[in-house]
Regions:
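Alpha-solenoid helical-repeat scaffolds
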Residues: 1-25
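Repeat-mediated protein-protein interaction surfaces in helical alpha-solenoids
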Residues: 1-8, 33-49, 74-83
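TPR-adjacent "capping" and linker segments in tetratricopeptide-repeat scaffold/adaptor proteins
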Residues: 9, 51-57
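Active-site-proximal segments of catalytic enzyme domains
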Residues: 14, 18, 22, 29, ...
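Repeat-unit-sized solenoid/scaffold elements
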Residues: 27-32, 179-181
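Structured C-terminal portions of repeat-based eukaryotic scaffold domains
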Residues: 40-44, 55-181
């Protein structure tokens, strides 16, 4: 993967996305230093675009920073970076989900629960083709079910209400096996 990403970066040296993708590959391999170098290169390339940099590119820089901190077990910094990414793009599903994960590891289950619930609530009014609809995923449902087990006064009731909601808003091909009872 890194050889392919290196070839892409050489063919389009001003494209920050290639460096960001290489950083993610390094994170997956546990190479924090390699990830940091790639993410810094992506950030510099994005900054060099100036006004031409899109909100998506700016948001990716913040999300990369958050993922780097999350992987490095620096949860407060990860939450700050993800919050900044969410401020740039309300429909940044990855930033919201990863911020919720960072909140769990930071010991703040209530914030994690609120982030996941708000992400699911945003789906109700989202256009069918909106990125916000990507929030309905088995991993989000499983994570929220786990958080309900730990925080809800009546976990069974909370999970049942969420499952009923998911059945109303989820696409037809949604994997319902993730829904606990």
């Amino acid at each position: 993967a890194l050889v392919w990403l290196d070839a892409l970066a050489r063919s389009e040296p001003d494209e920050p996305a290639h460096f960001s993708a290489a950083g993610r590959a390094h994170l997956m391999m546990g190479d924090l230093e390699g990830a940091r170098l790639c993410f810094e290169a992506a950030e510099k390339k994005t900054a060099a675009l100036g006004e031409a940099a899109t909100e998506a590119q700016r948001g990716r820089v913040l999300r990369d920073r958050g993922d780097y901190f999350l992987t490095g077990l620096r949860f407060p910094e990860a939450r700050t970076a993800f919050a900044a990414a969410m401020a740039k793009g309300e429909t940044d599903v990855a930033a919201k989900v990863n911020s919720a994960v960072a909140a769990v590891y930071d010991g703040d289950l209530n914030s994690s629960r609120a982030l996941l619930e708000s992400g699911l609530a945003n789906v109700v009014n989202a256009d069918v083709n909106s990125k916000a609809r990507a929030f309905i995923s088995p991993s989000v449902v499983k994570n929220l079910n786990s958080i309900y087990e730990l925080t809800a006064r009546s976990p069974a009731e909370a999970k049942r209400a969420m499952n009923d909601f998911i059945k109303l808003v989820a696409p037809e091909d949604f994997d319902v096996t993730c829904m606990a009872t």
